[in-house]
Amino acid sequence: MRDMQDDDTKSPAPPPAAAAAARRAAGQAAPDASALRDRFAKLAQADTPEAATDAAAAADDEVTRIRALIDEMRPTFRRDGGDIELVRVEGAKVIVHLSGACAGCMLAGQTLYGVQKRITDVLGRPFRVIPDIRH
């Protein structure tokens, strides 16, 4: 069986008792085993069908909220002779289609940044708004 070695020094890894003694000598606390157990328990729960259903429901709720935010902004786009439409959401990417005057506008990048900022502010996590190019 191959010895466990540190790639940098090529020396065997210290036994757990020696590692614990070195931590105590350096004034470091031992790792919190209960926190690790809790983390693994949460990871195990994430694999359940209920967790998958909850995650899908949360994603659907985010898409609904993003769609509502874009619908709130549409009158501004239409007033300027353009329009914005939600194409799809892929994780933290929001793909939108700009049409009319907005499609060829030199300020489209700034407009998309404004939409991105609004979505990020309201939903409380970062999103990236990307234009969908249709021909």
Curated annotation (Swiss-Prot):
It holds the Pfam family NifU. InterPro entries: FSCA_dom_sf, NIF_FeS_clus_asmbl_NifU_C. Keywords: Nitrogen fixation. GO terms for biological process: iron-sulfur cluster assembly; nitrogen fixation. Residues 18-29 have a biased composition (Low complexity). GO terms for molecular function: iron ion binding; iron-sulfur cluster binding. The keyword Ribonucleoprotein does not apply. Residues 1-29 are annotated as: Disordered. Residues 1-10 have a biased composition (Basic and acidic residues). Belongs to the NifU family. May be involved in the formation or repair of [Fe-S] clusters present in iron-sulfur proteins. This is Nitrogen fixation protein NifU 1. It comes from Rhodobacter capsulatus (Rhodopseudomonas capsulata). The gene is nifU1.
